[in-house]
Amino acid sequence: METPPFDPKAGEKAYYAKIGPDGRRHARHKPFSDADCGKYLANLGALLIMMEPPPRTVLDLGCGSGWTSIFLAKAGYEVCGLDISTDAIALAQETAAETPGLRVEFQAGDYEDVQPGRLFDYVLFYDALHHAEDEQAAVSAAYKALKPGGVLFAFEPGAGHSRNAGARHAVEQFGVHEKDMPPAYIWQLGRRAGFRKKLFLPAPSDLARCVYRRDYLKDSRTGRLLLEKSWGYLRALTKAARPSASGLIIMWK
């Protein structure tokens, strides 16, 4: 029997059907349903600090179940979430309807060929670009969707992601892409798309994990606490020294 061809876009479209009711429930209630809730809140909290306050518009590409879009809409932004999976969009719309008055809409579509019909202040890729079939097309589409001077934020897994056990499992079980997507590579894509400048930053969640540690709660000795805190600062400085390998990239149109 021939092995069917690998079609990651079909895998993305079928993903929410394959994960079952429990998986969809988990996706609906992110970030709070996820073991990495602290990571997500640290990253999105930093995003809110960096963005200009509402009213501003955001295009959330590869929004999945819509939790990032809804989070930003609850903070007052006008958000359009786009995902290739109609199941994901239905889930996002169902969740958004539970909070009347949100300025959020969801559209099914391919972010490699997005036609939003208007321009946005910000574009966000949150754990989404590394699933692309053609990441250059996706970044170029994001560029075209921005207003002059608009800003793209990308929180993506860095080097080595494609080799970890979770990524390999997702490829095997769901037939999706799980690519390495370090900020330095995203900048290569961005330059070709037309972005004029960039900033590499450590992922806020990485810095938080370095400095705010459970180890503090396990040993109340003052000397030990000071040592752990010092090591935490050193780890944070190490992360800050190499954000082009793994972290956040910001690019300006």
Predicted segments — roles?
Residues 1-53, 153-175:
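Conserved class I S-adenosyl-L-methionine
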Residues 85-87:
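Conserved SAM/SAH-binding beta-strand->alpha-helix loop
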Residues 92-93:
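Conserved SAM-binding loop
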Residues 99-112:
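Conserved SAM-binding strand-loop segment of SAM-dependent methyltransferases
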Residues 112-122:
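A short acidic, Gly/Pro-enriched loop at the edge of an enzyme's catalytic core
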Residues 114-116, 167-170, 199-253:
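A C-terminal cap/extension of S-adenosyl-L-methionine-dependent methyltransferases
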Residues 136-148:
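A short glycine-rich, Lys/Arg-flanked "PGG" loop and its adjoining helix->strand segment in the class I
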